[in-house]
A protein has these predicted regions:
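Lipid interaction determinants
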Residues: 25-99, 109-168
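Core hydrophobic alpha-helical transmembrane segments of single-pass membrane proteins
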Residues: 13-16
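C-terminal motif of bacterial Sec signal peptides marking the signal peptidase cleavage site
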Residues: 19-23
Length: 168
């Protein structure tokens, strides 16, 4: 009985030692890399694919892309040397629904866990314009955001811009 107990103890001790030695592996997982932010994905020069106007009262839509020179719309979302949002400019002869220049930032720089859309905030020094981001660039270089106009807190019209990143 002693021999069996002694042998089992020795096997258990040997197994525990082997596990402790192999468990102390120093595999290099690489250096820390910061996660990709929405600002990184959204920054750059964007040209219009389409602009849709939606009447929020009755959900009617109208394509404005070929009307009122919306096909000339370009927005440049610039970053500073550190990769942070900095300035923006709007070019083209489309109606000025957005400020033409100023600074930009995201309300939250990552995908929100509660699935609410992120907002792109444009500030021209006088007022801040909030754009609801409805599509973020990924495999396809497409950015989509919506500008919603309200009266007395109720939305009455929105403009959805579908943009493609310009070739650098």
């Amino acid at each position: 009985m002693r021999t069996i107990t002694g042998n089992l103890f020795a096997i258990g001790l040997l197994f525990s030692t082997a596990m402790a030695i192999t468990g102390c592996s120093t595999v290099d997982d690489g250096s820390y890399t910061a996660p990709i932010t929405l600002s990184e994905k959204i920054s750059g020069k964007w040209v219009v694919n389409s602009v849709m106007q939606t009447d929020e009262a009755n959900a009617r839509t109208k394509t404005l892309t070929d009307l009122l020179d919306f096909d000339t719309f370009v927005i440049n979302l610039n970053q500073d040397e550190a990769g942070n949002p900095s300035t923006f400019t709007v070019e083209g002869s489309a109606p000025m629904l957005l400020p033409t220049s100023g600074t930009w930032k995201m309300d939250y720089n990552f995908t929100k866990s509660d699935n609410t859309p992120s907002r792109l905030l444009l500030n021209d020094g006088k007022a801040e314009t909030a754009l609801t981001v409805t599509a973020v660039p990924g495999n396809t270089k497409t950015l989509e955001y919506r500008l919603t106009r309200k009266t007395n807190g109720q939305p009455f019209v929105s403009y959805t811009y579908n943009l493609t990143q310009a070739v650098k």
